[in-house]
UniProtKB/Swiss-Prot annotation:
Binding residues annotated for Mg(2+), in chain numbering: S173, T193
InterPro entries according to UniProt: G_OBG, GTP-bd, GTP-bd_Obg/CgtA, GTP1-OBG_CS, GTP1_OBG_dom, GTP1_OBG_dom_sf, OBG_GTPase, P-loop_NTPase
Family: Belongs to the TRAFAC class OBG-HflX-like GTPase superfamily. OBG GTPase family.
Protein name: GTPase Obg
Domain OBG-type G: 160-331
Keywords: Cytoplasm, GTP-binding, Hydrolase, Magnesium, Metal-binding, Nucleotide-binding
Subcellular location: Cytoplasm
Gene name tied to this protein: obg
SUPFAM superfamilies: Obg GTP-binding protein N-terminal domain (SSF82051), P-loop containing nucleoside triphosphate hydrolases (SSF52540)
Gene Ontology MF term list: GTP binding; GTPase activity; magnesium ion binding
Record-listed GTP binding positions: 166-173, 191-195, 213-216, 283-286, 312-314
Amino acid sequence: MQFIDYVKIYVKAGDGGRGCISFRREKYVPKGGPDGGDGGKGGDVIIQASSELHTLLDHRYQKVYKAQRGQHGKGSNMKGKDGENLIIKVPVGTVVKDAETEEVLADLDEEEKYFIVAKGGRGGFGNAHFATPTNQAPRYAQPGEKGQERWVILELKLLADVGLIGLPNAGKSTLISVISSAKPKIADYPFTTLIPVLGVVKYENYQSFVVADIPGLIEGAHKGAGLGHQFLRHVERTSLLLHLVDVSDFSESDPREDFEKIQKELELYNPALTKKPFAVVGTKIDIAYKGDRLGKLKKYCEEKGIDFFPISAVKKEGIDKLLHYLSEKVGKKCGLL
């Protein structure tokens, strides 16, 4: 299934039904008064969160959503039937924005949470509504009001406790496949992960938590380079970030610079991301034979007071210690421990 996390749609609420112009015409009521009924209200367009959905794929192909209009009023004071509301289901974690101003209209971060994105028009009054002592036979009724319409942006931000970030091929996919039941594509080339992957982690007697594997970031990601900022939004909701840095002998870059590049991209995208609790994970220690890169990164983290965990996901070295740390941190953050 394709992962779509950003779409633009048009919504139109139902118009109100028009009021009716009618008069009583009964055999023994020669001067029957007005009896035109009111028009029905137009249906609202409602966007509602559902845990059954995990992507905005459906809305990529259907861009226009219109609610039912209200029916017109009838004689004998019969009110027109209200139009049915149109409910648009989206994944939990979807943010609704005005397409023109980009103002956040709603953050649907809970199951069944909803937002009325376009309100239906009021039905028009029938002529019975306008009868007065001086005008007992009004030949006027109101038209229904127009329903609201607008373009909106639906933006999905995944709900995860821990976000795995790092340069391409840092070992994020391997780690999440070891600590959870998630099975992302794994290979020894950059950008293997093209979409965010979620995995549920259960460690000993701790509460389970959700980890998100975010596609690899590169310099300029905040401007859209590489897979770009389209996936940076998914780390905004996390409680804790894990910076994964390749410390193997096969990587030629300075591990300290690798870490700082990602920190810079986070700050340029959203400075609040650098304020989140985080730890650094040195990956692939099973092929860090010389230990130079591992030593540099470990010393750097010690000097900066950063929690550091050297691991080998392939050989499961250091994994237990890392999971214990994550379980305690996420548990405390969620108030579970």
